UniProtKB/Swiss-Prot annotation:
Residues 134-143 have a biased composition (Acidic residues). InterPro entries: BTF3, NAC_A/B_dom_sf, Nas_poly-pep-assoc_cplx_dom. It comes from Xenopus laevis. Belongs to the NAC-beta family. This is Transcription factor BTF3 homolog 4. CDD domains: NAC_BTF3. The gene is btf3l4. PROSITE patterns: NAC_AB.
Length: 158
């Protein structure tokens, strides 16, 4: 090809600029249900089995937060060493769940809990502690025992 024809063809080709049509890029919106279907199909390939009867799952992280699942769907594949936990998750502090979670804590979590308790400021504990005045007011609501009811029931039995 000669240079004149090549220059003429290059002048005709317009890549961008004023007057050219825009190419619209298609945006694919992914929904949560589509992601869930993909996840379930991947789990099906692993041959997972449902585990029934699990009321709650707590995942304790190193920073003292807990990922808490209430009534989750738990699936396991022992051959792939994989557990899938699906459901509504809540992120909570370990102090919020303390009375019920103590039996689930391991030795390392208990030591981190001790450290957390030592770091917990005394001011918060003092402000939450009930004052003696408040205790006396609560006692006023309870009526005092006037008579002995055990004797009356014994007399009726005789």
């Amino acid at each position: 090809m000669n240079q004149e024809k090549l220059a003429k063809l290059q002048a005709q080709v317009r890549i961008g600029g004023k007057g050219t049509a825009r190419r619209k890029k298609k945006v694919v919106h992914r929904t949560a249900t589509a992601d869930d279907k993909k996840l379930q199909s991947s789990l099906k390939k692993l041959a997972v089995n449902n585990i029934a009867g699990i009321e709650e799952v707590n995942m304790i992280k190193d920073d003292g937060t807990v990922i808490h699942f209430n009534n989750p769907k738990v699936q396991a594949s022992l051959s792939a060493n994989t557990f899938a936990i699906t459901g509504h998750a809540e992120v909570k502090q370990i102090t919020e769940m303390l009375p019920g979670i103590l039996s689930q804590l391991g030795a390392d979590s208990l030591t981190s809990l001790r450290k957390l308790a030592e770091q917990f400021p005394r001011q918060v504990l003092d402000s939450k502690a009930s004052k003696p005045e408040d205790i006396e007011e609560e006692d006023d609501d309870v009526p005092e025992l006037v008579g002995n009811f055990d004797e009356a029931s014994k007399n009726e039995a005789n």
